Amino acid sequence: MEVAAKLSGARISAQKARLVADQIRGKKVGDALNLLAFSSKKAAEIMKKVLESAVANAEHNEGADVDDLKVSTVFVNEGRSLKRIMPRAKGRADRIVKRSCHITVKVADK
């Protein structure tokens, strides 16, 4: 049994979120939550919420035991980009790209 949780449009770049996703992939849920709780990255806080949602889905919908779950799949896809302008000297402007991503976490029995 595999249960998923997805967050669309998280306001962090996919590159930064993938650094955290690579750390928790394949770990037991308890170990992954512990690792995310003590990580200082912004993506860790977002990823922790998605993982907790996946665990709650498994517990509520499938009646799974939390101690037996592991993170089977984590992937991060690029979302929409917000394009903004930063005024510069002499009438010029720089483009600012505010990136977002879609985070999917799947948990499964061992």
Swiss-Prot record:
PROSITE patterns: RIBOSOMAL_L22
UniProt family annotation: Belongs to the universal ribosomal protein uL22 family.
Subunit description: Part of the 50S ribosomal subunit.
Biological role: This protein binds specifically to 23S rRNA; its binding is stimulated by other ribosomal proteins, e.g. L4, L17, and L20. It is important during the early stages of 50S assembly. It makes multiple contacts with different domains of the 23S rRNA in the assembled 50S subunit and ribosome. The globular domain of the protein is located near the polypeptide exit tunnel on the outside of the subunit, while an extended beta-hairpin is found that lines the wall of the exit tunnel in the center of the 70S ribosome.
CDD domains: Ribosomal_L22
PANTHER family for this protein: CHLOROPLAST 50S RIBOSOMAL PROTEIN L22-RELATED (PTHR13501), LARGE RIBOSOMAL SUBUNIT PROTEIN UL22M (PTHR13501:SF8)
Entry GO CC: cytosolic large ribosomal subunit
Record's keyword terms, sorted: Ribonucleoprotein, Ribosomal protein, RNA-binding, rRNA-binding
Biological process annotations from GO: translation
Protein name stated in the entry: Large ribosomal subunit protein uL22
GO molecular function: rRNA binding; structural constituent of ribosome
InterPro entries: Ribosomal_uL22, Ribosomal_uL22_bac/chlpt-type, Ribosomal_uL22_bac/org-type, Ribosomal_uL22_CS, Ribosomal_uL22_sf
The organism's place on the tree of life at top rank: Bacteria
HAMAP family: Ribosomal_uL22_B
Gene, per the UniProt record: rplV
